[in-house]
């Protein structure tokens, strides 16, 4: 988001920058996209010994302490958009705004129930989350619907076993 502001500021000498899809308004004045470099899915991890059915998972994520990234981060902006699409407005006090590294430690220690993060599979943060025992990766069964409603979202599918073959994680192909 900072790069969007810098690109739009006529006093700033920056002429090009990397910006996460969706971080700028659809027609941001003075900014032209040159394409996408990679996919950065929205990963939501939640505390549970086993994967939960969609309704239980939604209840857990929406009624407990969830980190949605710092204000003006790409994760925060995307989470706000997804909450709005689901009719969730008003009191969002259960949604926390910690930096990713701090949120991961809080999730590991049990001080958070869920962490959502926009990043690549290879990122150190996603790799840390994948190695924490007792966490489940949330699927987005309606990923295709989100992708149709928000131009910056592209659906990706994590194939069965792609994150960890020996433990077959995820146990089914997971839309994200």
Which residues are covered by each model-predicted region?
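Short, glycine-/small- and polar/acidic-enriched structural segments
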Residues: 1-62
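Pocket-lining segment of extracytoplasmic ligand-binding domains
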Residues: 88-176
